[in-house]
Amino acid sequence: MEFWRHPGDLRVACDRARAGGSRVGLVPTMGALHAGHLALIAEARRRTDFVAVTIFVNPTQFGAGEDLARYPRTLERDLAACAEAGADGVFAPDVAAMYPPGEETRVRVGATAGPLCGVHRPAHFEGVATVVTKLLSLAGPCVAVFGRKDYQQLQVIRRLVADLFLPVEIVGATTVREPDGLAMSSRNAYLSPEQRRAARAIPLALAGACRAFARGERRAAALLEPARARLAAAATSIDYVDLADPESLAIWSDSAAIGERALLAVAVRVGTTRLIDNVVLGEDAPPVAEPSEEAS
């Protein structure tokens, strides 16, 4: 497996792979890799011949008071995991390489970035869009793979690629979950054992809405209120529990009657840790069984 620190080295390696007839796949990450990330690498491996993983804790997507300094950095362990997963190379630049002195360009995002996390992290998606554009420019992949846990990020990137006519297929990979249903996240490491137990309310809330939707419930309030109540009882605070159009991310009001597909997205804080998750009602299976079902 190759290891690149400089942007030009990533470009040269991907150019060389293409010249040899390989399809290039890109898996952008911020490191602290877990089984969810390894599933992204496997998906890229399945679709392409040369898989480049990027590990970069991108400062422009963190706001004031967020966890940039605290975010886990485990490069040596991550490199070993990438090699075992079959990556052909890892790009792990420092901040100065990606944002050299004098650089000032940012990618402006639109309406897709406005609701949900955009309300609470107003500069986040501009930072995401900027770094992803840089990485796509450097690697020139046929395919780039992102996790559906970060559903809004996935939609912002799809919009970016369409609007800028970038010749890359954006693949959204299924969320990988812990045995109790909690979505895998590098930030789960922040949770104490008690907080980790409380966080299980997230997949349970989503699962309850999935089952109600499957029974024919289409009133937004009837889907949202039980989820909000369950999360309010377990979380320190709630940023949002919303239903949205799965494509545009336009928010449906609590009084709406929704259609045959709907994104249910949540962001909560357990202690000081912000956790996000989602399901597409009408498409995704419940992320976890109800406790009574597990006991039967």
From Swiss-Prot:
Its EC number is 6.3.2.1. Pathway: Cofactor biosynthesis; (R)-pantothenate biosynthesis; (R)-pantothenate from (R)-pantoate and beta-alanine: step 1/1. Keywords: ATP-binding, Cytoplasm, Ligase, Nucleotide-binding, Pantothenate biosynthesis. It catalyses: (R)-pantoate + beta-alanine + ATP = (R)-pantothenate + AMP + diphosphate + H(+). One of its GO terms (biological process) is pantothenate biosynthetic process. The active site is at 37 (proton donor). ATP binds at residues 30-37, 147-150, 176, 184-187. (R)-pantoate binds at residues 61, 153. InterPro entries: Pantoate_ligase, Pantoate_ligase_C, Rossmann-like_a/b/a_fold. Its main location: cytoplasm. Catalyzes the condensation of pantoate with beta-alanine in an ATP-dependent reaction via a pantoyl-adenylate intermediate. The reaction proceeds by a bi uni uni bi ping pong mechanism. Homodimer. This is Pantothenate synthetase. It comes from Sorangium cellulosum (strain So ce56). The gene is panC.
